[in-house]
Design a protein with these regions (language model features):
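Active-site metal-binding loops of divalent metal-dependent hydrolases
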Residues: 13-14, 151, 273
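Conserved phosphate-binding/catalytic region of the ribokinase-like
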Residues: 1-9, 28, 214-335
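Structural alpha-helical scaffold elements that stabilize or flank donor/cofactor-binding regions
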Residues: 8, 138-140, 190-193
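Structural detector of well-ordered beta-strand residues that form the stable sheet scaffold
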Residues: 9, 75, 147, 174-175, ...
Length: 335
């Protein structure tokens, strides 16, 4: 694929997720922090129902599979360990039509392995990213889109290299969906990435943290404007069951969720499917209102099964859901 133009080049860590289904637990609210905690009995043996292992996941691998199923020519830049888990990840990517040309096998390292405590329809993830030596690949032809998401804490020089590449190739459009460690690095550290982004995705809580209003109540219109003022051309902010919002400097749009056909099984990957579908829609020539109408459909489908990729839709199936949408499933202009 090196001499062919890639539509969608995803960059980010690949992981194996082990879903541990637990039932002997409860959720309690931390009144001071306003957060919720998963509580299990301390110092005891806790029974679990079963374990389901899912390979080749993580924000960017999920996005690459999503884009591939929607019909884009897709590749993934990532590292795997020198182990059977890494080999299985490669097999999954190939089965999904994602080019593995830029996947590096790191000698002496393990493949990232996460443990997912799966309780009811939510998950708490125990994460560990290997400190791989990151390097940007030699691309003979610039891709149409780069999709950047979760990388480990030691990846700051890598982010700088990605920023330099996008600066040198202004025809390349960058989507940035920050992962946990990228959020921790903060705006100032990753200012170049924010300012070079064509598309930026986060949720309401993350947006408030980025703009320095973490503990304040804000109108969504103001939050959209402040987030876009950081540099991205198009900002998309999700708000859980309330839906999602987008702003391109001129028009603000609100989109409700696509109704679930049955209660969600597992919410892992809902954000990845949303962001990658929105990006893919733009890459396929769709407008912003059309893109924000596509995205929740794939998220709805993903949460109906275990893992972040099982429910990802083909373009044909997504458009079938769209044609059968409820009357009120329409983007609404809010400015």
């Amino acid at each position: 694929m090196s001499d062919e133009q890639i539509d969608f080049l995803a960059i980010g860590d690949i992981v194996v997720d082990a879903f541990i289904r637990i039932e002997d637990a409860k959720v309690e609210k931390d009144k001071e922090k306003g957060t919720f905690n998963l509580c299990i009995s301390f110092g005891n043996k806790i029974p679990y129902k079963y374990v389901e292992v899912v390979y080749a996941v993580g924000n960017s691998p999920n996005a690459s599979v999503s884009a591939s199923r929607l019909g884009l020519k897709t590749a993934l830049v990532t590292s795997i360990g020198d182990d059977p888990e890494g080999e299985r990840c490669l097999e999954v990517l190939k089965e999904e039509g994602v080019s593995t040309e830029f996947v590096t096998r790191q000698r002496g390292f393990q493949t990232n392995y996460h443990y997912v405590l799966w309780y009811e329809d939510e998950r708490t993830i125990l994460v560990k990213h290997q400190d791989y030596p990151y390097s940007f690949p030699n691309l003979e032809t610039p891709p149409k889109w780069i999709y950047l998401s979760s990388l480990s804490e030691n990846s700051l020089p890598y982010h700088n290299a990605i920023a330099e590449y996008v600066k040198a190739n202004p025809e390349v459009k960058l989507t940035f969906q920050p992962g946990t460690f990228q959020m921790g690095l903060g705006y100032e550290t990753l200012k170049d990435i924010y300012q070079l982004s064509e598309l930026f995705f986060c949720n309401v809580e993350e947006a408030k943290e980025i703009v320095g209003k973490k503990h304040e109540k804000m109108e969504i219109n103001d939050l959209l404007k402040m987030t876009r003022d950081l540099g991205p051309k198009i900002v998309v902010i999700t708000d859980g069951p309330k839906g999602a919002y987008t702003y391109d400097g001129e028009e603000m749009w609100y989109m409700p969720l696509y109704p679930d056909p049955k209660p969600p099984v597992d919410r892992t990957g809902a954000g990845d499917s949303f962001a990658s579908t929105f990006t893919s829609a733009l890459a396929l020539g769709k407008s912003i209102p059309e893109a924000i109408q596509w995205a929740p459909i794939n998220s709805m489908s993903v949460v109906q099964g275990v893992g972040a990729q099982k429910g990802l839709l083909s373009r044909e199936k997504l458009e079938e859901y769209l044609s059968n949408r409820p009357d009120d499933y329409e983007p609404r202009k809010i400015n």
